[in-house]
Every structure is written in C-alpha cells, then in structure tokens.
Amino acid sequence: MTFNDNARLDPSQVEDARGRRGGGLAIGGGVTLVILVVSLLLGVDPTAILNAVPTDTTTTDPSAQTVADCKTGADANKREDCRIVGYVDAIQQYWTDALAKHGTQYTLAPTVLYTDVTQAGCGTASAQMGPFYCPVDGKVYLDLAFFAELQTRFGAKGGPFAEAYVVAHEYGHHVQDVLGILSNDQRTGPQSTSVKQELQADCFAGVWTKHAADTGYLQAPTQTDIASALDAAAAVGDDRIQRETSGRVAPEQWTHGSAAQRQQWFSTGYSTGDYTRCTP
C-alpha cells in the first residue's frame, strides 16, 4: 500500500520509546525471596522494601531516529516507523469520521513504539507478547521487530500491508472500547466472547481497509495488498499456531479464532465497508 507523497503526517499520535534503554536493577525471583525472608525476620512489611528498590531507570539515545521526523507520506514510503505513523493517522481519521456519523465521539489513542520491553498501563509490555491494545491507558503497544517475527515465526509473507492489518486490528480493539463493547472475558473456544471479539477486530480492520484511501493518506489498496492482509490474518490463526507448535489442533483453547475465521471476518469488513455488520 502506497502513501500519497504530499500527505501531512501527525507524528504526535505515536509515542516513540525505542531510544530508551534500561539501566536499573532487575529484581529476579531469588533476590525477591531473600528480601521477603529478611523482612519477615525483621518484622518489616516486605512491600515497603520491594517498592523502595529501583527496578527501572532509563536513558535515551539522542542520536536515534524518532517518529518526530515523520512529516509526509513520502517519509512513510521510505521508513517503516513513519509508515506506522501514517497508518495510525489514517486509521484514526477514518474512525473519527465513521463513528461521528453514528453519533459516537471517537477518542484518539496513541501507539507506543518500543524495543524489547516497556511499561504499559496493563503491566510490563514485552516483544514476546506481540502487539496489543491496553484499555487501562488506552494505548496500542508495538515492537517493530514483530513484523519480522510474523514472517519467521508465523510463516506470513509480510509486507507493508500486513503491517497495516496488524495496526488496524489493534485499533479495532480500541474502537470496541470506545463503543463500550470491549470485554475482559477470558473463556476460550471457537464460540467464546474472546474469539468473537478478535474476529470483530479483524472485521473492523477490513472495514478500514475499504475506506483507507478516503482519508487522503493512502492510495487505494491493490489486490496484492488485500492478499497480504489475508495471509497475515491466517498466519496468526489459532489452529495454524497450534499445529505448528504442538502438532495438534485444540479448538477448546482458541482465543483468537482459526485462520479461516480470521480471513472470513476481515473479508466481511472489506466487502461491506460497514462496521455495523461486524457481528461474529
């Protein structure tokens, strides 16, 4: 998917935490156990000691590129981080307009770009978790290394629009939050609320894809772009991940839906262009 070169990007919608490097003391399980034993022997509240120990100090690399440099669509066509800025801008522009037509005010949600680990409102965010939306602070968290992992670990073909699909999916969860339908139900299975919620986010991503060019940031997606998104959706299907990691499929453990389901609901969103039709 190509950005219009003269599109003006708003990098303020992306928080860049990639230049930060931890320099503090990491408390391992053994150290924690020692602290607990000593505090109990001394009759001291162990939480007072644990809270007093510095667990994270950070430094910033001033020479690192930041998203503040992302000004135009031309920048987005050249740099991956600027591409994410452009996707975030286009996604939020669409949802601002789409929800307003139905009488709902959309609240902007920043994306936090980080490397390896960072602190989120929902706890510690690590690259192993993959991209996610945190309803506690209303932010999307993304380590750009995930896109390489999408290909090497999950077998996706990758590409710029696979990235767009991932970002749009996470913003789908923010839209659910805005609409008051984001659930914390942890039950699993093909018909679980958890799976339906993920499939709805896929559908919302498809809806945005249908209207992406209307925002002024992007050119209309090509069939290659759509195929890339569908390929990425299938790559993170529960059945495919289970088959590749354990050699068997256990539907009762699904949390995100099968490859076929994820492709189906992205396609539903794209074909209808109507988010009110996203009802798995």
Where are these regions (language model features)?
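Catalytic zinc-binding patch centered on the HExxH motif and its immediate surroundings
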Residues: 50-52, 117-143
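Active-site recognition of the HExxH zinc-binding catalytic motif
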Residues: 37, 95, 142, 165-178, ...
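Short pre-active-site segment immediately N-terminal to the catalytic Zn-binding motif
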Residues: 146-165, 189-195
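Post-HExxH zinc-binding segment in Zn-dependent metallohydrolases
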Residues: 2-17, 191-217
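Pan-zinc metallopeptidase signature
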Residues: 239-280
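Short helix/loop segments within enzyme catalytic domains
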Residues: 82-88, 92-94, 98-100, 200-239
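Post-HEXXH active-site segment of zinc metalloproteases
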Residues: 177-199
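Long amphipathic alpha-helical segments used for membrane anchoring, targeting, substrate engagement
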Residues: 1-69
